[in-house]
Curated annotation (Swiss-Prot):
GO terms for cellular component: cytoplasm; excinuclease repair complex. It comes from Rickettsia typhi (strain ATCC VR-144 / Wilmington). Residues 20-97 form the GIY-YIG domain. It is found in: Cytoplasm. The lineage of its organism: Bacteria, Pseudomonadati, Pseudomonadota, Alphaproteobacteria, Rickettsiales. This is UvrABC system protein C.
Length: 626
């Protein structure tokens, strides 16, 4: 491939025709991968900055890697902000400040499309069939809140299918976590009262709620309904206890507190969530390699990326100002189709104290993060020396597979780096045929059936095919769970794709004992390491993570396939008989545990059909226990 100009000369040539208006520009590398997306109030002026002599090292590296430059004209700065945020999210350019951990926060969902609404944890977009409360910063916090709610209000948490199949109360009723509406232990009217009380509690109308409960308790007492009055009394006590644990603030109602701190080319942004005056937890976000980036730039990038996915409060309270604040507000409002949003930076008062608290938490989080990086970098240096790598590995990919005699086969890829395991980059490769019926084996694809090497060949072929479109995710080192034969397969697939990635195969030693692992590399004799060496322990941790991830996904796929098909695919068991079985026994598990005689008692199930069902389900149980 021949390119006439690149880098600084390319930018100079583009400046000549660049317009003097707002817009977005993209820098692309030699393989036409987007490496940077930027916005500008005036495109010509912004591009001119890249040919100055006082640029930092990061910008110089970016320019040196630029072989193509494209720009898009926008009607306004706000439109440029919006487009820039969308393109960064789409292309994830390596020279941009990226929000890598952008998973959605969990909520508590109260389903309202059922006579007896369900209370459960929920992730995702707002739905029309329920009301969401949150967001919560972690699963722990939402689970703790749900547990408290179930103790106090005893609303159901089961699925509609499970609810509809019950013929007797489940364990939740026995441990006083549910009123068992599924079998008529509570009527619709009384259940609706509980639903309203849950709403009041989650919207922090607790004073009003407690007053209403006190009145109800007195009313029941005057009617000599002492058992019901005692239950209301216990509910009031439980609510008071929960309130003591979670202080409700008057100073903020619906806000995100955001503080940014900086140390050693690393930023941490701590987000504390407050809804209805109640703290819903906080979570840190880290940004690295931000050489010469300012607090304002990092915060602006963060806000525009963060609020593309997360719920926007009515107020964002920060410890640092940003450039073009009004434009950022307008962009966030347009992204989320909202009309009410303010961003403030308080310098005194209660809100300033909350910001300072978030800043202290951010500093602590950043210090812990940097300690983790330092420790992992030291280990990575040992890995570099051990395998004679050209540089400290940035990305290590570990591969393993799991199956039972070729059934439910999966291959997995686990990724590790200086910040530890990068779970967002984990991948699962399904290696089984999708055509599964009870009574027939789940077949591997023809080219890999019963062949461990064939499975690895399939996984690597798919991985390298994808790598052609993701050159920025090229691993520094690959570790494969296997021995000498696997070494040959890896080399064969690499040669086919023209790849030259350092790799090592790691096999269990004598009697498959941990600590006796053998390492296989091209052109070297098989060798082992002292099991007490830090680098050996690290390699074992990597291998075990891949192994556990493979087993988890194998079992998940096996359980899902069998559970779906165990009843659905038995000849003679249609929807009516399946429903009859579930209604009679109360759950799928109870059907599996039933004897032939018990199965035959269900209306529509003959003795011969009961025998067939019993045999199929027991085959499933034997697989689950293997």
């Amino acid at each position: 491939m021949s390119l006439e100009i690149s880098g600084r000369e390319l930018i100079k040539s583009k400046i000549i025709d660049a317009p003097e208006c707002s817009g977005v520009y993209k820098m692309l590398d030699v393989s036409k991968q987007v490496i940077y997306v930027g916005k500008a109030k005036i495109l010509k002026k912004r591009l001119t900055n890249y040919i100055k002599s006082d640029l930092d090292n990061k910008t110089l590296r970016m320019i040196a890697n630029t072989y193509f430059l494209e720009y898009i004209i926008t009607h306004s700065e706000v439109e440029a902000l919006l487009l820039e945020a969308q393109l960064i999210k789409k292309f994830q350019p390596k020279f941009n400040i990226l929000l890598k951990d952008d998973k959605s926060f969990p909520f508590i969902k109260l389903s309202l499309d059922h006579d007896f609404p369900q209370l459960l944890k929920y992730r995702g977009k707002a739905l029309s069939d329920g009301k969401l409360f949150g967001p919560f910063a972690s699963n722990t916090q939402v689970n703790t809140t749900l547990t408290e709610l179930q103790k106090i209000f005893k609303l159901r948490s089961c699925t509609d299918n499970y609810f509809n199949s019950r013929t007797r109360p489940c364990l939740q009723y026995e441990i006083k976590r549910c009123y068992a509406p599924c079998v008529g232990k509570i009527n619709k009217e009384n259940y609706r009262v509980l639903v309203i009380q849950v709403k009041d509690f989650l919207q922090c109308r607790t004073r009003e709620l407690q007053e209403n409960l006190s009145k109800k308790m007195q009313e029941l007492s005057s009617q000599m309904r002492f058992e019901e009055a005692a239950e209301i009394r216990d509910r009031i006590k439980a609510l008071s206890y929960v309130q003591l644990k979670s202080r409700i603030l008057d100073v903020v109602k619906n806000a995100d507190i955001i503080s940014i701190v900086h140390k050693d080319l690393h930023y941490c942004i701590e987000v504390a969530l407050y809804r209805a005056g109640q703290p819903y937890g906080n979570i840190p976000y880290f940004f690295s390699s931000t050489e010469n980036s300012t607090h304002e730039e990092v915060l602006e990038y963060f806000l525009l990326q963060f609020y593309q996915k997360q719920q926007v409060p009515s107020e964002i309270i920060m410890n640092h100002e940003i450039n073009s604040k009004e434009n950022v507000i307008e962009a966030i409002k347009k992204i989320n189709n909202i009309s009410d949003l303010s961003i403030i930076v308080p310098h005194k008062g209660d809100k300033a104290k909350l910001v300072h608290k978030a800043e202290v938490n951010a500093l602590f989080s950043l210090e812990q993060y940097l300690k983790k990086i330092t420790k992992n970098t030291e280990i990575m240096f040992e890995v570099k020396k051990l395998f004679d790598l050209p540089e400290i590995p940035e990305r290590i990919e570990i591969y393993d597979n799991s199956h039972i005699q070729g059934m439910f086969a999966v291959g997995v890829m686990v990724v590790a780096g200086k910040i530890g395991f990068d779970k967002k980059e984990y991948r699962v490769f399904s290696l089984s045929s999708r055509n599964f019926t009870i009574g027939s084996e789940i077949e591997l694809r023809d080219d890999i059936k019963g062949d461990d090497y064939g499975m690895l060949r399939q996984v690597l072929t798919r991985r390298f095919t994808r790598l052609k479109n993701e050159p920025n995710k090229l691993p520094s080192l690959m570790i494969i769970d296997g021995g000498k034969g696997h070494l040959t397969v890896v080399k064969e697939v690499m040669d086919k794709f023209g790849m030259n990635i350092p790799f090592v195969c790691m096999s269990k030693g004598r009697d498959r004992n941990a600590g006796l692992e053998q390492l296989h590399m091209q052109g070297k004799e098989v060798f082992t390491l002292d099991k007490n060496l830090l680098v050996m322990k690290y390699l074992q941790i990597l291998r075990d993570e891949a192994h556990n991830f493979a087993i988890k996904n194998h079992r998940l796929g096996r359980s899902r396939a069998i559970k779906i098909s165990s009843l659905d695919d038995i000849d003679g068991v249609g929807e009516a008989r399946k429903t009859a079985l579930l209604h009679y026994f109360g759950s799928y598990k109870a059907v599996c545990n039933a004897t032939i005689d018990e199965l035959a008692k269900v209306k529509g199930i003959s003795k011969s059909l009961a025998s067939m069902i019993f045999n199929v389900l027991n085959r499933k149980i034997s697989l689950d226990n293997s």
